[in-house]
Amino acid sequence: MPQTIVLDFETFYSQSYGLKKYTTEHYIRDEQFQVIGFAYKVDDGETHWVTGTDRQITEALQGLDIPNAYLICHNMAFDGAILAWRYGIKPKYYLDTLSMARPVTGLTVGGSLAALAKKYLLDEKGTEVVNALGLRREDFPADQLARYGEYCKHDVDLTYGLYHVFKQWNPPKELYIQDLMIRMFTDPVLKLDKNVLVDHLFNVQDKKAKLMERIDATVGRDALMSNPKFAVVLQKLGVEPPMKISLRTNKEAYAFGKTDQEFKALADHHDPRVQAVVAARLGIKSTLEETRTESFIGIAERGSLPILLNYWGAHTGRASGGDKMNLQNLPRGGALRRSITVPDNHSLVAVDSAQIEARVVAWWAGQEDLVTDFRNNVDIYSSFASIVYGRTIDRKKNPNDKVEGFVGKTCILGLGYGMGPDKFKATLKIGMGGISVDMPLDEAQNTVKLYRAKYDKIAQIWKDAQAALAQMSKGFECELGVGIALRCTPEGVHLPNGTMVRYPNLRKNADGFEYDGRYGPVKIYGGKMVENIVQALARIVVFDQMAKIDIELRKCDNPEADRRYKVALTVHDEVVSVVPTTVASWCLNFMLEVMKVPPKWCSNLPVSCEGDVGNNYADAK
């Protein structure tokens, strides 16, 4: 293994300028940014503190052999971006102890250096940073700057210790994926089209203003912005406010979200006044499009588009959006997707793994008839819809079968985890892609029964998972699954790549089973456990394919010649690369080839994919 260098920067911050108010990207690129100093450790040697003028700090960093070293930091997105953007230095390999910790501690102590050090090193993180508020490098008294240096050195020592704690739980390929994701942020290649964004912002604000004009005189903005006040507005109109149980607090809360089925249904209320206030509420509360567009414009003015993904951001190992910018749910074909573009003479190549979760659940449960249909490229959605409606459905060739095809798709993608009739009915009502189906409850019940009868092995694995939970909660081990038998222990489910889906302190309660989450107990049952495992397995498949693609592209990457070959982004089950336009067709074919081959541990899993090439993210979808 090459030389390791542990590094930690201390930087200027104030009441108005810091990571609590700024994104990481904005903070580092802002004109107020200043490095106070940094600490470093080479291999297991002595830890050093460096401060001084900008030139002295730059020379000290350049004196370290970082380009040929494995760089270790805690929260690499911060320190790695400072190195890359401010000093033009990139290491041979990024090792981020925050990313390394998440698969182990994400549900318990979290990822802060202080919490991890206390639990795993039995050591305390210092607090000297608090005294640095508002002080630029030239403002520090000598003694305070020296104390700050000791504080920084201690952070480096803690990071070094945590690296040795967590490396045992991070297989080499997962470390590569962490490095890949860090480079999406520290070495960005995507750009933003400011003109597209400015036009879109005008349209969004104009639409919101017109919505407000409709109800300003009768309701007022304050009532729309406040959940309790808006509840009173509905009650005065004779409507009982819909409620739900908050996943975060586990307490009852108003169901006024854009995807809350009962609230969305009020937009079709027979009283026009109710329609108006609900539409206006959705408009004024749905400021995500507006604020995200404004954020994109700011990034466009500062430079390229860094993609910060939280490695293992979800319980099942999937990534989540970071830096207050989630690209996981951009509207298809919308202006925000269209604004994401590439450097001159380059193209964007996007390949999406097809129905990966539905394929994995069928394979893992041993549902051979469904696996065979996937392998033979049968239109599964139309096939199952034909059973539901008692006639031949062909959603691809018959435009009149569009709704029925949507129902079939919802069944295949939604019923594999034990979804009941009520939720199935609500899911159809919420709709997707402009289609919404108001299925009677008795029809929803029959459809769920049809699915469970036809795909009985999938229904059986929910029961097997429930039995596994009982064994695990008693401290026993067992195996679960047909396509691959996974080892289940009291700690969780062991995955084929050496990671785990963890269930900390799994136990039986009066209602079933629960485990410790970040915000309190989390309910778990057979169908949910199957969903967790299938998502984790699907994630391994796609991320392993992404790593294979990236390994090949890195061989050709040449930033100095402005010829980039790079995996730039991953969204759900999609991999997005940027390559010179002259090789875009080759890259598409290569990515399609890679993503049609499963890993060795699931060599008989039928995987498929589709992709395209474009000048922007919308065109490549």
Segments (PLM) and residue ranges:
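Short active-site loop/helix that positions an aromatic residue
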Residues: 77-89, 102-104, 231-238, 354-368, ...
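Conserved catalytic palm subdomain of right-hand nucleotidyl-transferase polymerases, strongest
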Residues: 7, 73-74, 95-98, 342-356, ...
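Short amphipathic alpha-helices in soluble, non-transmembrane regions
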Residues: 587-595
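Conserved "right-hand" nucleotidyltransferase catalytic core of DNA-directed polymerases
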Residues: 1-10, 15-17, 33, 39, ...
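Active-site palm subdomain of RNA-directed nucleic acid polymerases
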Residues: 166-178, 541-575
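Function-dense linear segments that define catalytic or interfacial modules
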Residues: 308-395
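Active-site-proximal helix-loop-helix substrate-binding element of RNase H-like nuclease domains
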Residues: 33-40, 44-59, 63-168, 178-180, ...
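Conserved catalytic core of nucleic-acid polymerases
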Residues: 240, 302, 311, 390-558, ...
